[in-house]
Amino acid sequence: EPTPLHDTPPTVFFEVTKPIEVPKTKPCSQLILQHDFAYTYGQAPVFANYTPPSDCPSQTFSTIVLEWKATCRRRQFDRIFGVWLGGVEILRSCTAEPRPNGIVWTVEKDITRYYSLLKSNQTLAVYLGNLIDKTYTGIYHVNISLHFYPAKEKLNSFQQKLDNLASGYHSWADLILPISRNLPLNDGLWFEVQNSNDTELKEFKIPQNAYRAVLEVYVSFHENDEFWYSNLPNEYIAANNLSGTPGNGPFREVVVSLDGEVVGAVWPFTVIFTGGINPLLWRPITAIGSFDLPTYDIEITPFLGKILDGKSHKFGFNVTNALNVWYVDANLHLWLDKQSTKTEGKLSKHSSLPLVVSLVSDFKGLNGTFLTRTSRSVSSTGWVKSSYGNITTRSIQDFYYSNSMVLGKDGNMQIVNQKIIFNDSVYINLPSSYVHSLTSHKTFPLYLYTDFLGQGNGTYLLITNVDLGFIEKKSGLGFSNSSLRNLRSAEGNMVVKNNLVVSGLESTQQIYRYDGGKFCYFRNISSSNYTILYDKVGSKCNKKSLSNLDFVLSRLWPFGARMNFAGLRFT
C-alpha cells in the first residue's frame, strides 16, 4: 500500500562545500528571523531587529556563522534572495525547488568578516520575491539564526590587538559601508542593471583615517541573461530573423568604477540556479554556488588618496553586453588608523586598458560555430601614510575568457565550451621594506550540451549534459596556502509538456577537494533520480591520497567533447 504523501519525509537538498572551521567552544545562538514567504513579489523586504548577544560568557568571537534553514512543499519556481544587515549584504542565495512531499535545506555561511557590523544594533532585511497562484503554491518557511563562537583565551589578545600593521591585513575591517540601494524599497537592496548602457551609482563618504579599503561585490544574473554564457551573437539572430532569443553573445563582465574611473572588474562564476537548464540535475545536490553565491573582492587601497578628503564620492556598476537583468551591489570594507584622525595618500599609477575582444563566426542558416575570446587587465599603485608609516599597495587584475559554441540540428542542438581565468594579486610594501602579497588564481570551466526534440502537442524531450568547475588557489599574508577544486558532471533528460516537467532521468557526480595545509576536506558524491548512490568524505591532509585524487580528477576533468542549451528553464 503506498505511503500517504503527508507521511513521506521531506527530501533534504544540499550544496557540496567544506564545513566551516569553528572552535570547540559552545556557540551563543540567536534566532533572528522566522517568516513564511508566500506572495512576496514586489513587496517590501521582511525586517527584523538585530541586537548583539549580551548573555555570552565572552564578548570576543573567533567565528560567526549565519544559518538559513527553510522548508517548502508542493510546486514552486527557484527564487533568488538576499539577506542584508544595516544595508550590507551578507548572503545571496537561491531557493531549492520543492517536491509535493516537501523539501528542507540549510545554508551555513561564515560571516566573521562582518564582525564590526555585528557589534552594534542593526536592521536585518530579507527579500525573497515569491509568487503564489493556482499552479505554483509553494510557500517558503524560513528560519535565520546566528551562531557566535567565543574565542579561546589564547586568541583573545591576538584577535583584539590592532596596534601592529600586519593585524590590519589579517583581521576583519573596522567599518563596512553598504554600497547598495537605500530603503524603503519594494524589492531587494541590490541595484538592477538592465542593459549595457545602464550604470548604477551609489554615493558614499569614508572616515578620513582609513588606511585600507576592499570592495566586496555581490552579483547574480536573471531573466534574459540567466544563461548569458549560451546567448547567441546578434548577427546570427538578425540573419535568421529570430525574435525573443537572448542575444549580445556569450561574454559578460561587471565593471566597477570610482568617480567614473574603472577600478576593477568581476568576471563571474557561472552559477546555475536550482531551476536552471534541467531542474532535475540539481536534485537533491544543487549546483556549485547556488546556495551561497560567491563574492568578489577588489582592492581599493591604491585609490584611498582620492577619497580621503571627507567629501562624497560615487561607485558605479556596469555590465558589458548586459541584457535584463543583473542584480549587483557591494560592501566597502575599511580599516581605520586608531592612532590618527587623518591619513593621507596618493594614486601614483593606474592602468585600465580597453577590453580586447575577438569574435569569429561561421554559420549558414541556423547551424554554425562561434568563437569568442576576450581579455582585460587592471592595475593600480598608490600609497597611504598613517601612524604605521608609508604603505604602498599595488593591485593587479588579469582576466582571460574563451567561449566556443556550436549550433546544429537547425538550432535545436547547442554545445558550449567556456573557460574563464580570473587572477588577482595585491602587493603591500610595508615601512620595513618587507612586501606582503595576496594572490588568488581562479579558473571557471563550463561545458554544456542540450538537444531539443519536439514531440508534438506542446511536448518535447530535452537532453542535457553539464560539466562545471570552480578551481581556485590562494596564497599570501602569512596564511597557509589553500587550493580548491570543485568539479561537477551531470547528465539527464526530461519530457516537458506545456512548460511543466512530466518525467525525466538524471545522474550526477561531484568531486570536491579543499587543501588548506592544516585543514583539508574531500568529498566524492554521486546521485541519480533523488537517490544518493555513494558519498565518500575525508578530512585528512594526506599527500599520498591527494596525489591519487589528482589522477582521478585528471580523468574526470577536462571532460571529453560532450555536449548546452538555448536558455530553456522549466519547473
From Swiss-Prot:
This is Peptide-N4-(N-acetyl-beta-glucosaminyl)asparagine amidase A. InterPro entries: PNGase_A, PNGaseA_N. Its EC number is 3.5.1.52. The keyword Glycoprotein applies. Heterodimer of a large and a small chain. Pfam families: PNGase_A_C, PNGaseA. Keywords: Glycoprotein, Hydrolase. Is highly glycosylated and is largly resistant against self-deglycosylation. Glycans are attached at residues 121, 143, 197, 241, 318, 367, 390, 423, 457, 481, 524, 529. It comes from the Eukaryota. It catalyses: Hydrolysis of an N(4)-(acetyl-beta-D-glucosaminyl)asparagine residue in which the glucosamine residue may be further glycosylated, to yield a (substituted) N-acetyl-beta-D-glucosaminylamine and a peptide containing an aspartate residue. The lineage of its organism: Eukaryota, Viridiplantae, Streptophyta, Embryophyta, Tracheophyta. GO terms for molecular function: peptide-N4-(N-acetyl-beta-glucosaminyl)asparagine amidase activity. It comes from Prunus dulcis (Almond).
